[in-house]
Amino acid sequence: MGKKRIYELAKEMNKASKDVVDKAHQLGMDVKNHMGAISSEQETKLRQAFGGGSTVNTQSKATNNQKQQTTQNKPANKKPMNNKPGEQRNNQNRPNNQSTNGQQRNNNNQNRHGQSNTQNRSNQTNTNNQNRNTQNNNGSTTNQNRTSQNNNGGNNQNRGGQNRNNNFGGGQNRNNRNNFNNQNRNRFNKKGKKGKHQQESAKPAVPARKFRELPDVLEYTEGMNVADIAKKIHREPAEIIKKLFMMGVMVNQNQALDKDTIELLAVDYGMEPQEKVQVDIADIDKFFEPEAVVEENLTTRPPVVTIMGHVDHGKTTLLDTLRHSRVTSGEAGGITQHIGAYQLDIDGKPITFLDTPGHAAFTSMRARGASITDITILVVAADDGVMPQTIEAINHAKAAKVPIIVAVNKIDKPGANPDHVKQELSEHELIPEEWGGDTIFVNISAKFNQNIDELLENILLIAEVEDLKADPTQKAIGTVIEARLDKGKGPVATLLVQQGTLHVGDPIVVGNTYGRVRVMTNDMGRRDKEAGPATPVEITGLNDVPQAGDRFVVFEDEKTARQAGEERAKRALLEQRSASSRVTLDNLFESLKEGELKEVNIIVKADVQGSAEAVSASLQKIDVEGVRVKIVHAAVGAINESDVTLAAASNAIIIGFNVRPTPQAKQQAEQEEVDIRLHRIIYKALEEIETAMKGLLDPEFEEKITGQMTVRELYKVSKVGTIAGCYVTEGFIRRDSGVRVIRDGIVIYEGKLASLKRFKDDVKEVKLGFECGAMIENFNDLRVDDAIEGFIMEEIKQ
């Protein structure tokens, strides 16, 4: 027999489903609710618990007989329905060979249609009496099946008008209702023609949602909504909304909650509220803090050495000698155009070298090289001595607090004087060790490989003293040495790893760009899969070209790296837009004040050299007190992108004489907000500049009387002051104008109006012939017939 549900058993025993469920729990049965299914043994226990055990035995017996008859007589289910009426009457005296299921269906049809059949009333009476005695779940027993043969026959004979069992008790037989429910439950086993129209079996009950315990701590961020909190504490949003409603807070599941509400809700649930600190993923500088390094994982790393000095003093030649390669031959004109990063192995000890340009235009690149280095080699030519870029390199190294090794180069040349170099450098606090100082001096010849080993020994000695260490196990961080856009590879960046190990495939944020390391190439042009601390590598895979000097950080996943890179690019764009606007002839007065000294930066471009010189000389002759003209650049030719870049960097105005800007320069000028003025006549250009420069002078003001009014009445109001009822006798009085109180021709007070009203309404201006009420700031000693004079200060144009 199939399992029975709790609500069916409760209906049979005239008990509430809840009582049966509770009794089942007491007996240790795993029942969730009234839809739970129980076995026949569990049903027996429940009936015995409610005092009805004998009925269960009869039911079980009937159930067994029913199963046997169903198995033996399955083909007989269809045969009686096809018999002729005469055969059906003969079948009434035949022993009952029909299955219980077939009889149940026929009896069900009789009960459902409710038509009378007087031929079988006596048999129905016997059946009903027997049903009341047995009251089993199927509504019939084996004896009942024997005595109800005539019912079957009568039913088959009268299929057009089916008969109804009469219940002498005054209502429909309860057993027949149970029989109807049981038939519906077992009909899915029925095969044959009528099985198509039978009802589907009841689906199993959906298991109840598993109860999950509340967490001990609610980690929240301010602004979380109800739906987010519901997921964290494993509760329905409706439950949280109801609880908040009981606390007096009306919200929906998508409404953001403040910090206090979230904490009160957590306390009400018995959890400890803990605010989660929001981490700014776009802030990559925090990865470079010393606290982020784990001391236990530190290992010795190679030193980073920067070669600095004046142009053409032999820096690249020295590195060329160290690398045994011809780096100089590949440079334009033999002058280093960008920072080169190389790693050399000296007796099993690697050293990373950075070669910086010595030209005057590369100041920022030298400063960047000094900021990421451990040791600075200052190359000075013995025949040339200390030069401007030499002094600049010294200042960069001192600012970065980096030890300096002085390499006196070109000692092989005639006229070389290393002692003179030492004398000059001692004036800049670089005193040789033999003179009692702490600076190492090495006399070398990079061209002929003289004393190079001594220089390398001193580098390794200082590196050992400095005890340089790094953590190779963490995510890689470092600095961009240089970057470019390659036609075949796309954005290419040369990186110097400072901490951690960089791998191929790592998600990376470089400055305001992001991407994944696709190809990693070392300084020898070979592909590597990883790069440790103090190792320079060239990578591809970025979405844009970063700026030299930008920092890079490796992230856990590409999604986070993309978010950080996009956020950094967005912030950089907003910062650029919010920066102060460029100088134009229209805003010179507001934007070019430098204390007492003011100057206008101008770039002059002309069609011929003579015109450029003439315009420059004429502009410099403009004599306006306190303002001077500075010619940043003067040249011949069209206004190009370089001119716009220079103007943006120097905050200058471009004057074009008989020339036009190129389309690229015009577009860049719009982006950089650089002011370009084009002229064909010299004196008009001079006049325009002179007019703008006059606007830079401190303005002079003169007083202008706007009107006068007479005091006719006084109203003294406590805690407010004296209100004067006035009549305008001349001109007009403005709310923002200055006023003088004149009594008997003598000015007794000068100040500003506190309020000006007409008919209790604040007004900006009262004209001639109108009355008004006025109050003067910090002055209440007004009298009737006092004159109040209004005035404003106007700027005098120069």
From Swiss-Prot:
Region (G2): 334-338
Keyword GTP-binding appears in the UniProt entry: yes
Residues annotated for GTP binding in this entry: 309-316, 355-359, 409-412
Subcellular location(s) of the protein: Cytoplasm
Compositionally skewed regions (Low complexity) per UniProt: 57-186
Region (G4): 409-412
GO cellular component entries: cytosol
Chain positions covered by the region annotation G3: 355-358
Keywords: Cytoplasm, GTP-binding, Initiation factor, Nucleotide-binding, Protein biosynthesis
Annotated GO MF terms: GTP binding; GTPase activity; translation initiation factor activity
Domain of life: Bacteria
Family annotation (InterPro entries): EF-G-like_DII, IF2_II, IF2_N, P-loop_NTPase, Small_GTP-bd, T_Tr_GTP-bd_dom, TF_IF2_bacterial-like, TIF_IF2
tr-type G domain residues: 300-469
Keyword Cytoplasm in record: yes
Stretches for region G5: 445-447
Region (G1): 309-316
Compositionally skewed regions (Basic residues) per UniProt: 187-196
Signal peptide stretch: none
Region (Disordered) residue spans: 40-207
Family: Belongs to the TRAFAC class translation factor GTPase superfamily. Classic translation factor GTPase family. IF-2 subfamily.
Listed PANTHER family: TR-TYPE G DOMAIN-CONTAINING PROTEIN (PTHR43381:SF5), TRANSLATION INITIATION FACTOR IF-2-RELATED (PTHR43381)
Functional description taken from the UniProt entry: One of the essential components for the initiation of protein synthesis. Protects formylmethionyl-tRNA from spontaneous hydrolysis and promotes its binding to the 30S ribosomal subunits. Also involved in the hydrolysis of GTP during the formation of the 70S ribosomal complex.
Identification of the protein by name: Translation initiation factor IF-2
Biological source species: Enterococcus faecalis (strain ATCC 700802 / V583)
Lineage of source species: Bacteria, Bacillati, Bacillota, Bacilli, Lactobacillales
